[in-house]
Amino acid sequence: MDNKISTYSPAFSIVSWIALVGGIVTYLLGLWNAEMQLNEKGYYFAVLVLGLFSAASYQKTVRDKYEGIPTTSIYYMTCLTVFIISVALLMVGLWNATLLLSEKGFYGLAFFLSLFGAVAVQKNIRDAGINPPKETQVTQEEYSE
């Protein structure tokens, strides 16, 4: 696979961070202001943390496989399974919650925005490491001479 072209875009990186932080803050503010028991808030918080970790870990595993970095199938399948479980837990929790439909949609959108942000930020961090900005490349070339 010689067609591994990864580009780093500062604009996309900034938007990714905004999506990640915005999704997490929105989700947590919704939990903070929600009129639900503390154990329910803990459930939704744990689902968010599980989803963020599994999404970033799954993206990294897929990227490692694409770049030819050895990964085990068991870890790949574990990441995928945990990601699916986190989404299913949120869906089941919202389905059974005594919330308004608009509140359920709010939590769902904030959750998926956070997952997108986590994957995009992780991708951008990795791309920045592979293709550093040109100023950094010039500096490294000067030191190697």
From Swiss-Prot:
Membrane topology note: Multi-pass membrane protein
Periplasmic side: 33-41, 95-98
Keyword entries, A-Z: Cell inner membrane, Cell membrane, Membrane, Transmembrane, Transmembrane helix
Any one GO CC term of the record: plasma membrane
Location (main, coarse): membrane
Entry's transmembrane regions: 13-32, 42-59, 72-94, 99-121
Topological domain ranges for the Cytoplasmic compartment: 1-12, 60-71, 122-145
Any single biological process term in GO: DNA damage response
Entry's localization field: Cell inner membrane
Database matches in PANTHER family: INNER MEMBRANE PROTEIN YIAA, INNER MEMBRANE PROTEIN YIAA-RELATED
Name the record gives this protein: Inner membrane protein YiaA
Protein species of origin: Escherichia coli (strain K12)
Native organism taxonomy: Bacteria, Pseudomonadati, Pseudomonadota, Gammaproteobacteria, Enterobacterales
Gene: yiaA
